[in-house]
């Protein structure tokens, strides 16, 4: 890691702390109204109406409650997918993949997000997993992302992306785990590898979702950070 990258990581860590502290001071009732307004605005947008599939997330307490979007998408017959974190650990020099909480026999080396189809109310189809995040139950069907994008070629797909902060231009500050960075990079690679990679209709639209207080002029970023196509916020 270069000195420039080290400095960027230090800046990100400091800003994450500030954003968490700032969010803790926000009024819960005001947040609920803002969440509801954002969801209604998105559901009425052409981006939502023209989409055939939505990659969503189960919100943490400091994230916009996107459940109304997910429920509307299910009712409207769209494909809805939610993530489950899969950790990779190194134990006795042997890599192992497991789901759930950190394994005490080794340290987490990295991880990824797998996505699962949700066909009913997300509250019914999820359960609390690692870090208090609600994830799809084992009864949900796991998506083969590569095949899914092959089958959906030519259709419009939306990926809702949470974050601690965004810029109006679409740059994002995540929580530091890198799960969305890796997933978005993976999706970008899948689309670039496809025979219709130059057709914008085959590429998913990355939509950052946040409160107005989470919009900043700048966030520390590195070359691998992927820009959002849209930032959904009452700020814009």
Predicted regions and their residues:
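A residue-level signal for conserved active-site and pocket-lining positions in enzyme catalytic cores
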Residues: 19, 56, 80, 160, ...
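Surface-exposed, charge/polar-rich loops and edge strands
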Residues: 2-10, 14, 21-24, 128, ...
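Glycine-rich nucleotide phosphate-binding loop and flanking beta-alpha elements
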Residues: 62, 88, 166-167, 179-181, ...
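Short secondary-structure boundary segments
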Residues: 58, 84-85, 163-164, 211-213, ...
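Short, charged low-complexity linear motifs
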Residues: 38-40, 158, 162-166
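Short Gly/Thr/Asp-enriched flexible loops that form oxyanion-binding sites at enzyme active sites
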Residues: 65-71, 170-185
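N-terminal hydrophobic or amphipathic segments with adjacent small-residue motifs
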Residues: 50, 164, 168-172
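N-terminal active-site beta-alpha-beta segment that forms phosphate/nucleotide-binding
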Residues: 2-151, 155
């Amino acid at each position: 890691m270069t000195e420039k990258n080290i400095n960027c990581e230090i800046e990100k860590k400091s800003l994450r702390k500030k954003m968490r502290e700032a969010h803790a001071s926000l009024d819960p009732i005001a947040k609920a109204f803002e969440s509801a307004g954002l969801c209604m605005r998105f559901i009425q947008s052409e981006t939502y109406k023209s989409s055939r599939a939505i990659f969503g997330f189960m919100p943490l307490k400091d994230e916009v409650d996107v459940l109304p979007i997910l429920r509307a998408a299910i009712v409207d017959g769209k494909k809805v997918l939610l993530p489950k974190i899969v950790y990779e650990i190194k134990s006795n020099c042997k890599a192992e993949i497991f789901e759930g909480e950190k394994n005490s026999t080794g340290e987490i080396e990295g991880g990824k997000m797998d996505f699962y189809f949700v066909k009913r109310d997300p509250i019914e189809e999820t359960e609390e997993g690692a870090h208090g995040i609600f994830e799809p139950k084992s009864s949900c069907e796991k998506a083969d992302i590569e095949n899914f994008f092959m089958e959906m070629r030519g259709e419009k797909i939306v990926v809702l992306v949470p974050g601690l902060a965004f810029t109006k231009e679409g740059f994002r500050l995540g929580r530091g785990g890198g799960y969305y960075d890796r997933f978005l990079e993976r999706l970008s690679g899948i689309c670039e590898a496809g025979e219709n990679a130059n057709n914008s209709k085959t590429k998913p639209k990355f939509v950052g979702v946040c409160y107005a207080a989470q919009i900043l002029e700048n966030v520390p970023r590195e070359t691998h950070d992927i820009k959002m196509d849209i930032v959904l916020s009452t700020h814009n």
